[in-house]
Amino acid sequence: QAHKTLHAVRLNNLRPGTKYCYRIFSQEVLEWKHGDNVLYGRTVASNVYKRAPFRFRTFPATGTDCSFVILNDIHGRADDMTELCREINFGKHDFVMLNGDMSSSIENEEQLFRDFIDASVNLYASETPILYNRGNHETRGVFADRLHDYFPTRNGRHYQLCKVGSVCFLLLDCGEDKPDTDIEYGGLADYDAYRREECEWLRRAVASETFRNASARVVFLHIPLDGGTWHGSNHLRNLFLPILNEAGINIMFSGHTHRYGFHPANDEVRFPVVVNGNQSYIRCDMTGDRIAIRIVGPGGRVAHTHEFPLR
């Protein structure tokens, strides 16, 4: 697409669980007056002379083992994120989940890269996949509607169902945390209707054969379902919780509160919820019979651990 400077390339017919190599080249279009009258400029590329090609591995089609890292509530603190993740060997993990509020608002492309994309590329994103789950702050700003261009999904929505081996992941979009009529949104929000539409999609997703036959079922939702009395939390709880309680969920990961929290399964929420703070990351290792979780803070200090059996 010669009229754009942002390119999303979809690779088809890749084999599951297979390592691929790639390099990037892009040639400038200086002028395009009409038809085939194109004047080209310089070509920029990844470093093809001094380093090996980038490598990535596609998700496996089968298997119960899975490992991933979760980051959330960075709010543009790219330097803090870099320091926090300095000792992580990202090559050991299947993906990195960005679970919302990586920016405080999204005003332009330059800010998006400055807030976390450039740091993510330097740390891992050239070779380890990102799964992006929008938080309430990423709905804000004049450039917010463009976020999906940088993190496209197969279904064209901010919520989706993903599968790694036989493990299913539900990425649920929380929308905003305050009523749509709040002065902060300037009359531009309609998240009650948006969440109702998402709820109907969720009902179909958990009824799908892919989800029902999964070896484990993991949910990512930026705002915790039991995260307080704000309007967004209440609306999410009223809509999503009755469906999730009947769906055999093994674990939910949330953020939003900027502090660690753990909510064991109970009669109201029938699955455990782990809430990550804004000064830590989560490492999750899944096997056929357990989920092992470590919450790691600055300096690589393990602050909390959890382990859950898979029934």
Regions from the language model: what does each represent?
Residues A2-A8:
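Aromatic sugar-binding surface patches on proteins
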Residues G76-M81, S104-E107, R134-F143, D177-T181, ...:
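Active-site environment of divalent metal-dependent phosphoester hydrolases
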Residues R10, I24-R55, E110-A207, L239-N245, ...:
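Extended active-site neighborhood of metal-dependent phosphoesterases/phosphodiesterases
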Residues P16-S26:
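Short beta-strand segments enriched for Tyr within beta-sheet-rich domains
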Residues Y185-G187, Y191-A193, E209-M252:
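Active-site-proximal segments of metal-dependent phosphoesterases and phosphodiesterases across multiple
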Residues V9-P16:
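Short, flexible loop/turn segments at beta-strand junctions in immunoglobulin-like
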Residues V69-N72, F95-D101, T128-N136, V218-H222, ...:
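Active-site neighborhood of phospho(di)ester-bond hydrolases with catalytic His/Asp-centered motifs
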Residues H3, S26, E31-E109:
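N-terminal active-site segment of His-dependent metallophosphoesterases
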